[in-house]
Curated annotation (Swiss-Prot):
Domain SET: 11-248
GO MF, one annotated term: histone methyltransferase activity
The name this protein goes by in its record: Histone-lysine N-methyltransferase ASHR1
Zinc finger (MYND-type): 56-93
Chain ranges passing through the membrane: none
Organism, scientific name: Arabidopsis thaliana
Coiled coil stretches, renumbered: none
Length: 480
């Protein structure tokens, strides 16, 4: 671990042990917003292949794929990716080929990740693959597993998964309990590898990044450049500060966030935001994000439960909303929501759009205008409307979502930047060039912090902005 400390010191970082948190990453100098704090290639990674979509094992692209003729599990986009993956896939391929064809469909991305973990460990031990300071199995061994906190049901699932891995590998030296413990490590430490627009493409293990602890109001952000994990500062971070990222979706009440962290990561968050639990600001925030709207449609107040249990009282205009009215709306909403498809097929999109609009109307009557459920419905509608190329309506929804994002996320959160980017592209497409320039500038100002300025994604955004500016100038001149 001395090598690791030196590696981190060279990057003005250090690891300290904190009570309740364990290993934590600290700065040894000031970092400015947008500065890269740490980057790491995955120790192992696999794409999220499904029955409807496959990805290249090397680059995660989806175009022009060919299946490995031997194992029939892995896909490649060409010989370059196949060659780069061959040392690892050669042994994996043999192992998968031994498995009955019918059982290969049970090889999920997580199972493959575990198979690759042991194959890579063996290849590094045999010196077929190099061992480096940041790419070695000892970093995986140092990860926390939380095995003592796992319930019996989850332990049984890990045991079943470990049996399948053992059946695939057939390594005499591998212990089933160790495999189960590593599955627990995956649950707490593996990261979804996302594209520049934060869409999940695969999963990977980044042991250095896993040293970074969670906060619901983090000072850094994790993004991916292809499969490289890159951690950038979101704020000005002073020397000797702890680096934190968010492990979960932070839009939600303290109770919702705590529940999510406990279920997935098995810890109770004590960050600055969570320490406000039960205080007036936290109660207001929860009521806005997950509570009901005022009975007066023109009022923007939030509702709290009436002490006499008659309903909910608006904290702005003091109007009472009856329990019966809320219950009836919630029941109607539940009935309609149960009919809504999670991922409608292309031919069902129009019907799905109408159904989600009905859900939206009921949510507008029931929830606060900044509520998370309403925001999620509008996100779905935006995506579906863009899929069927109903651009004007898509733009309207985009404009409804942006203010909610600005309310629920920090100012430099990449999701706000990406939403402005979508808005700018839609405005430009619909001939609203001046508005498009404004939206694209806002997108660039946020995304340069999370994504840097030299990535292909940001170069494309920059080019679009320049083109839109030129078009706006031309239109302005044409008016004179």
């Amino acid at each position: 671990m001395a090598d690791l400390q030196r590696f981190l010191q060279d990057r003005c970082l250090g690891v300290s042990n904190l009570p309740q948190k364990g290993r934590s990453l600290f700065t040894a100098r000031d970092f400015r917003p947008g500065e890269v704090i740490l980057s790491q290639k995955p120790y192992i990674c696999v794409p999220n292949n499904t029955s409807s979509e496959s990805r290249c094992d090397g680059c995660f692209k989806t175009n022009n794929l060919k299946k490995c003729s031997a194992c029939q599990v892995v896909w490649y986009c060409g010989s370059s990716c196949q060659k780069s993956e061959w040392k690892l896939h050669r042994d994996e391929c043999k192992a998968l080929t031994r498995l009955e064809k019918e059982k290969r469909k049970f090889v999920t991305p997580t199972i493959r990740l575990m198979v690759r973990l042991y194959i890579k460990r063996n290849l590094q031990n045999e010196k077929v693959l190099p061992i480096t300071t940041t790419d070695n199995y000892s970093l995986v061994e140092a990860l926390v597993s939380h095995m003592s906190e796992i319930d019996e049901k989850q332990m049984l699932l890990y045991a079943q998964m470990a049996n399948l891995v053992n059946l695939i590998l057939q390594f005499p030296s591998v212990d089933l309990r160790e495999i189960a413990e590593n599955f627990s490590k995956f649950s707490c430490n593996a990261h979804s590898i996302c594209d520049s627009e934060l869409r999940p493409q695969g999963i990977g293990l980044f042991p250095l990044v896993s040293i970074i602890n969670h906060s619901c109001s983090p000072n850094a952000v994790l993004v991916f450049e292809e499969q490289m994990a890159v951690v950038r500062a979101m704020d000005n971070i002073s020397k000797d500060s702890e680096i934190t990222i968010s492990y979960i979706e932070t839009a939600g009440s303290t109770l919702t966030r705590q529940k999510s962290l406990k279920e997935q990561y098995l810890f109770h968050c004590q960050c600055a935001r969570c320490s406000n639990f039960g205080k007036p600001h936290d109660i207001e925030e929860s009521a806005i994000l997950e509570g009901y709207r005022c009975a007066n449609e023109k009022c923007t107040g939030f509702l709290l439960r009436d002490p006499e249990e008659k309903g909910f009282v608006c904290q702005k205009c003091l109007l009472l909303r009856s329990k019966e009215e809320v219950k009836k709306l919630a029941s109607d909403l539940k009935t309609v929501s149960e009919k809504a498809p999670t991922s409608p097929s292309a031919e069902d999109k129009q019907a799905a759009i109408e159904l989600y609009k009905t859900i939206e109307k009921l949510q507008v009557k029931l929830y606060h205008s900044f509520s998370i459920p309403l925001m999620r419905t509008r996100e779905k509608l935006l995506k579906m409307l863009m899929d069927v190329e109903i651009w004007r309506e898509a733009l309207n929804y985009c404009r409804l979502i942006v203010p909610v994002y600005q309310r629920v996320y920090p100012a430099t959160h990449p999701l706000i930047g990406l939403q402005f980017y979508t808005q700018g592209k839609l405005e430009w497409l619909l001939g609203e060039t001046k508005e498009a320039v404004s939206s694209l500038i806002k997108a660039f100002d946020i995304l340069r912090i999370s994504h840097g300025i030299s990535t292909p994604f940001m170069k494309e955004l920059s080019a679009k902005l320049e083109e839109a500016r030129a078009e706006a100038s031309y239109k302005q001149l044409a008016l004179h």
